[in-house]
From Swiss-Prot:
Native species: Polaromonas sp. (strain JS666 / ATCC BAA-500)
Cited NCBIfam families: PRK05412.1
General function of this protein: Nucleotide-binding protein.
Upper taxonomic lineage: Bacteria, Pseudomonadati, Pseudomonadota, Betaproteobacteria, Burkholderiales
Protein name: Nucleotide-binding protein Bpro_1596
UniProt GO MF annotations: nucleotide binding
Amino acid sequence: MPSFDTVLETDMVKVKNAVENTSKEIGTRFDFKGTAASIELKDKDITLVGDSDFQIDQINDVLRNKLTKAGVDIRFLDVGKIEKIGGDKVKQVTKVRDGIETEQAKKIQQLIKGSKMKVQAAIQEGKVRVTGAKRDDLQAAMALIRADMKDLPLSFDNFRD
C-alpha cells in the first residue's frame, strides 16, 4: 500500500552555523560594543541575552537573516517571551522545532479524516504516516495538508509505492 511520512525536520548544522555567525556579527557590530549582547545554542534552545528588549529584537533580526541565508525556514523557530534577569539584562529563549508535536499531529489526522479521502493517518513519534490505496489520493492528501498547515514548514518523505 502506498504511503508517505509528514515530518517537521530542521537541519541543525545550518542552525548552529547561523547562531555562530550571529555571535560573530554581534562581536563586531558597533552598536553592540560594551553590552551584554550574546547568543548561545544548547541542544534545540537558542538563548539571546541583551541589555534591553530593543537589543534582543536586533539580535533576533540578525539571527533570522543568517537563517534565511542558510536556507532554514524561520517557521522552525518557536520564539519565547522576553524575561528580565538580574542586573538590567533581559533574555529570550527560542526553541527550534523538530518533530511534529502531538497536538499538531492530531490536527493533521483530523484534517485527513474530515476530508473523506480514501487515506488513513497514523501518528508515529513526531511524524504522521499517511497510507492509501492510490498514489493520486496520497498526492491530494499532501496538497490538503500543505494548504491547511501553513504555519508549519512540513515536508514529506519516505514516499513508498
